[in-house]
């Protein structure tokens, strides 16, 4: 019986890499999203249905999935967080891996968006955002004593400025 969707230890042998980016330093309200990746991964070990009706077999039979945890990102400043995420994504994209970023707050996506620009034309990639907020702010100066233009509330502004078409739901 398959117990986990994470079925490959070596990220370079995997088809899909789940990248845990637990970070919530620029969250505007309650903190705790930094713990999201850990909780998601815990449930992926025993709460996922693997059977594919289309292929009539378990997806784990033909998709290798690995996990990379970037550690405690809250100890870093926003620029260092995005650099770490971008560097990780650059390395994985170079090896043609499909990347899932498990955040943390929305700003962790910026590093991934930046890495994708190196491989794909932004106009050929559409970013679909499902959120109650547009996240198009210039910075977080209206709710932070230490404002940054890399806050979670700026993520879609960054996507748009990189040239990505965005669809907001």
Tell me the role of every PLM-derived stretch:
Residues 1-169:
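Conserved alpha-helical scaffold segments that buttress catalytic/binding sites
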């Amino acid at each position: 019986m398959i117990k986990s969707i994470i079925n490959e230890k070596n990220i370079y042998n995997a088809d899909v890499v789940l990248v845990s980016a637990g970070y919530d330093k620029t969250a505007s309200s309650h903190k705790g999203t930094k713990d999201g990746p850990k909780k998601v991964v815990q449930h992926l070990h025993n709460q996922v249905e693997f059977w594919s009706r289309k292929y009539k077999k378990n997806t784990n039979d033909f998709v290798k999935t690995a996990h990379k945890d970037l550690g405690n990102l809250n100890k870093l400043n926003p620029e260092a967080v995005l650099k770490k995420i971008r560097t990780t994504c650059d390395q994985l994209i170079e090896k043609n891996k499909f990347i899932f970023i498990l955040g943390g707050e929305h700003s962790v996506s910026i590093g991934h968006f930046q890495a994708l620009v190196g491989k794909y034309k932004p106009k050929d990639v559409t970013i679909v955002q499902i959120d109650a907020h547009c996240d198009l702010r210039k910075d977080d100066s209206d709710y932070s004593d230490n404002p940054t233009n890399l806050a979670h509330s700026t993520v879609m502004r960054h996507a748009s400025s990189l040239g990505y078409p965005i669809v907001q739901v």
